[in-house]
Amino acid sequence: MSIRLEKPWQPMTQENINDLSGQLGVYELGDESEQVIYIGLADARSKFGLRGEMQQHLSSARYFRCEVNMAYSTRYQELLMVFQADKGRLPELNSDPGYLGRLSPLGNDSGQHDTELDKTPED
């Protein structure tokens, strides 16, 4: 199982936003090349859940993908850490939350990537 958000991109249109549920979860916003520019979450403070969050971003992104997830805070941090491990930085529209751990992708024989928390030399 991949820890990356691998759902298909959807065009950021009012029609697609209206089809979303009001549930909680995480999402990624993409530019015209479907490159991640922001990772966000719909948490307990979000009005109308994922639908409300996408409505706020209607004019700032071309594409989105989302995942309903009740462990949204942990999943959000996980997606940020994976992006940072892959690209060496956070998405351009995310600010540094200041509390992220680090992941190190490890290749295996299947060609998929696993992750492992970085260990200090004392470990």
How should each PLM-predicted stretch be described?
Residues 1-37, 41-123:
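Boundary/linker segments flanking structured domains
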